[in-house]
Amino acid sequence: MASSLVSSFQPRSAFLGDRNVFKVSSTPFAQVGYSSKTIECKESRIGKQPIAVPSNVTIALEGQDLKVKGPLGELALTYPREVELTKEESGFLRVKKTVETRRANQMHGLFRTLTDNMVVGVSKGFEKKLILVGVGYRATVDGKELVLNLGFSHPVKMQIPDSLKVKVEENTRITVSGYDKSEIGQFAATVRKWRPPEPYKGKGVKYSDEIVRRKEGKAGKKK
């Protein structure tokens, strides 16, 4: 009886089978900070894309400092040490990682996008459109000020930066344009912030491509 029990006993590893096998990835890993953990450093799909430079755009690179000049204006950007910018013989720009870390991977895609926005901005420009929805809501441009009537007891006056152009059509359609995409977005967001669109009647300031999720009022729920 004892011998049969001994013969039927098997180590735990025999029951686990393939679960004891550890698979090792061939993808390179990098150490992060002082942590004992390792992470997989994946290549950024956005970061590895080349940047085309039009003939009317001038690129000046000194160390980690980049200056881009075009017919619409001039922009500057300083790169972190985790990434660097190189110019190929073909004329394309490439953003490359200098180290293999999680932060470098994040900076890779981010600074490729920022650099591309600079090149497009000084050559073609960007614009952002807003729409005023509401009875009595209107906008006008008075010199270097955007004047908004949004139902408050007094009009809202916003100073227009020198690098931006603001145009108003039909008193309710605002177009903000310029060569600095981040500045355009910030100015447009400030305009919208004065009266964000409310979900019941849709009144407020919204982006032209914004979809406002509508809610049913209390009166509609009782029916």
UniProtKB/Swiss-Prot annotation:
Q: Which SUPFAM superfamilies match?
A: Ribosomal protein L6
Q: Which UniProt keywords apply?
A: Chloroplast, Plastid, Ribonucleoprotein, Ribosomal protein, RNA-binding, rRNA-binding, Transit peptide
Subunit structure, interactors included: Part of the 50S ribosomal subunit.
What is the protein name for this chain? Large ribosomal subunit protein uL6c
List cystine links: none
Query: Where is this chain's protein located in or outside the cell?
Result: Plastid, Chloroplast
> What is one Gene Ontology biological process annotated in the Swiss-Prot or TrEMBL record?
embryo development ending in seed dormancy
Please give the PANTHER family that the UniProt record associates with this protein. Answer: 60S/50S RIBOSOMAL PROTEIN L6/L9 (PTHR11655), LARGE RIBOSOMAL SUBUNIT PROTEIN UL6M (PTHR11655:SF14)
Q: Transit peptide span?
A: 1-41
Matching InterPro entries, A to Z? Answer: Ribosomal_uL6-like, Ribosomal_uL6-like_a/b-dom_sf, Ribosomal_uL6_a/b-dom, Ribosomal_uL6_bac-type, Ribosomal_uL6_CS
Protein's UniProt keywords contain NADP: no
Kindly list the GO CC terms recorded for this protein.
Answer: chloroplast; chloroplast envelope; chloroplast stroma; extracellular region; ribonucleoprotein complex; ribosome
Identify its protein family: Belongs to the universal ribosomal protein uL6 family.
GO MF entries: mRNA binding; rRNA binding; structural constituent of ribosome
What this chain does, per the entry, is described as:
This protein binds directly to 23S ribosomal RNA and is located at the aminoacyl-tRNA binding site of the peptidyltransferase center.
Q: Which domain of life is it from?
A: Eukaryota
